[in-house]
Amino acid sequence: MLVPLHFLAVGVGAAAGAWLRWLLGLKFNVSGWPWGTLAANLGGGYLIGLILGLITLHPEWPAWVRLALVTGFLGGLTTFSTFSAEVVQYLERGQFGHAAGYAVVSLAGSLCLTALGLATAHLMGR
């Protein structure tokens, strides 16, 4: 069910996360290495752990808080944070093969599909 406050929470959080990612890129992606992107991804990995942990400690917090911070803000900042949380969940459950497999497939798949997307765009531009 779409609750207007939830819809707003995701949108505002996503805008803030995207703006931060953009600002990090402007400030730090200047030396040939994407330090701003790395900061967004690694920071997002830390923040999703922190936020999910706090939400677990505070079940009384309303749903819009999680939606604004996790789905919105971290979704706008990076989807890498969700991936990190999922791998850690496998590790916490002792599913080391699943964790490794998911990490390898996610990274290799993302790199391959990025290359494929670039190649497709190149072909479309001919």
From Swiss-Prot:
Q: Which reaction does it catalyse?
A: fluoride(in) = fluoride(out)
Note whether S-adenosyl-L-methionine occurs among the keywords: no
Q: What is this protein called?
A: Fluoride-specific ion channel FluC
Q: How does it sit in the membrane?
A: Multi-pass membrane protein
The residues that cross the membrane are 5-25, 35-55, 68-88, 99-119
Keywords attached to this Swiss-Prot or TrEMBL record, sorted alphabetically, are: Cell inner membrane, Cell membrane, Ion channel, Ion transport, Membrane, Metal-binding, Sodium, Transmembrane, Transmembrane helix, Transport
Binding, Na(+): G75, T78
Q: Which Pfam families match?
A: CRCB
Q: Where in the cell is it found?
A: Cell inner membrane
Question: Ion transport as a keyword?
Answer: yes
Q: Which PANTHER family does the annotation name?
A: FLUORIDE EXPORT PROTEIN 1-RELATED
- How is the activity of this protein regulated? Na(+) is not transported, but it plays an essential structural role and its presence is essential for fluoride channel function.
Offer a single GO CC term for the protein: plasma membrane
Protein's organism: Bordetella avium (strain 197N)
Q: Which GO molecular function annotations are given, in alphabetical order? A: fluoride channel activity; metal ion binding
HAMAP family, per database record: FluC (MF_00454)
Q: Which family does it belong to?
A: Belongs to the fluoride channel Fluc/FEX (TC 1.A.43) family.
- Chief location category: membrane
The record's Gene Ontology biological-process terms are:
cellular detoxification of fluoride
Report the protein's function. Fluoride-specific ion channel. Important for reducing fluoride concentration in the cell, thus reducing its toxicity.
